[in-house]
């Protein structure tokens, strides 16, 4: 059985939660490897919706091991609330185990305060932060002053590291941003309470993963957000603070890259984006409004309206390259039903320069680009009942075939509705 990485090919919100939930049936271990509670994965099982921000989507299945890896930044209050909510609704199976890496960094109150203060102070275009403290937490990690789960669980060490951080952060908050200082003792007391509630979940998750692999148990690595929010490969500076590409599944969980066998790229049948940043195929018209309305395009974390547009294959081809994607899972194909004509962006044009496979990193050049479109005929048939490719209208099949030809990667799954069962499965990546 293979180990499989699932990543987004766009700007997040591609429907990874549903696909991970589906693949979790075949995996024995499901591991998150980056991001924090700035991303939300929406699952619909038997008509009931569940939104998870930190806990892996596989938590709804029996007999699983769910891991929050060292590459994730953890807000302990959010983690506790998710655990208690799932247990209260009877959705945390007693035979499924949850572990949090001792090396995962902790989001502190001053991270959230700094996040919001910086965004407020920015002149001109905002980054579009969720205000959850993700960026500042990763900054502390890189600056080697961050507080990890293992530090939080050691009362003496936590007090020492907290004192150093509060002194520095209060200087920045008060002197640079004119914000009120945070209170060290209040934070200490609050987080010591959290520590006791999460202590039983803390573990060396790298060792757990190694043991499970040696037993031949298939592992699913769950990415958050999407390739073009990646700190290295995204539309910088309108990106997140972590690496969202498949290669980080290794670093963010503590297993070797040779253990990763398949990479599944999740691609929405059109394109959406939350917050600021370039979006060449954005539709500020009736079609864009229709995609937003029919697709229910509101952020699972922020509730913000998602910007909508035609499918941008430049983004997808770029994602295929940087993540080494071996199979595509197409989501929300049903949202396109009823559109007479569909457009695919197959390149960017700037003067005499054509960019068919990668996004220009220079924001000035990107701003000057125009999308190059191909047109395809749409369909009117309701496809939500389709369970195999032959059930789809011919034009829907042609649309999927064109995505394959443009990327050189096979479509292995098609989602035709929000429910777990509203899916066409063409290949099981765990059988590779």
UniProtKB/Swiss-Prot annotation:
This is Adenylosuccinate synthetase. The active site is at residues 13, 41. Keywords: Cytoplasm, GTP-binding, Ligase, Magnesium, Metal-binding, Nucleotide-binding, Purine biosynthesis. One of its GO terms (molecular function) is adenylosuccinate synthase activity. Plays an important role in the de novo pathway of purine nucleotide biosynthesis. Catalyzes the first committed step in the biosynthesis of AMP from IMP. Gene3D superfamilies: Adenylosuccinate Synthetase, subunit A, domain 1, Adenylosuccinate Synthetase, subunit A, domain 2, Adenylosuccinate Synthetase, subunit A, domain 3. Its EC number is 6.3.4.4. Belongs to the adenylosuccinate synthetase family. InterPro entries: Adenylosuccin_syn_GTP-bd, Adenylosuccin_syn_Lys_AS, Adenylosuccinate_synth_dom1, Adenylosuccinate_synth_dom2, Adenylosuccinate_synth_dom3, Adenylosuccinate_synthetase, P-loop_NTPase. Its main location: cytoplasm. Pfam families: Adenylsucc_synt (PF00709). GO terms for biological process: 'de novo' AMP biosynthetic process; IMP metabolic process. GTP binds at residues 12-18, 40-42, 306, 332-334, 415-417. Signal peptide: none annotated. It is found in: Cytoplasm. IMP binds at residues 13-16, 38-41, 130, 144, 225, 240, 304. Its cofactor is Mg(2+). Homodimer. The gene is purA. Substrate binds at residues 300-306.
